[in-house]
Amino acid sequence: MRPNNDIRVILVERNRDIDSSELGIFGKLYINGTYFCDTLENRRFAVPCGLYEIDYNDSPKFGRKLPMFFDRGNYDPSRGLRFHAGNSPEDSQGCILVGERYWLPSGTISKKLRYSRDWTERLCNIFDHDERRVTKTILVVATI
């Protein structure tokens, strides 16, 4: 089911079978049902599965607008959970990193993301472009 045009649904789907590292949890990010990019979270600070709202606002820490997500009933703006750039689980303390997984020359898949800044920029461009048209963005975090 595709949402109407004024609501955007972002799904972060973490798969137990995906090769995650000791420190990180990998997943896939979908926007309105279409695959967008890979994700990485710090296992210690991973976002609990659930339903969140997203605001696109200024981040003092990063000095720019970034998507920030929160649980309306448990809202703690000081926590500042966001989608942002980063390559390894150590780059996150509860946020979701966006980027691309890749194969190493040895034939194994990397435990890090690459092109994270590019994917963060692409995600922000979607929010910039749709800011007037989309009235609400919902984030669903699930482990399958």
What does each model-identified segment do?
Residues 1-137, 144:
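Cell wall/extracellular polymer interaction/catalysis modules
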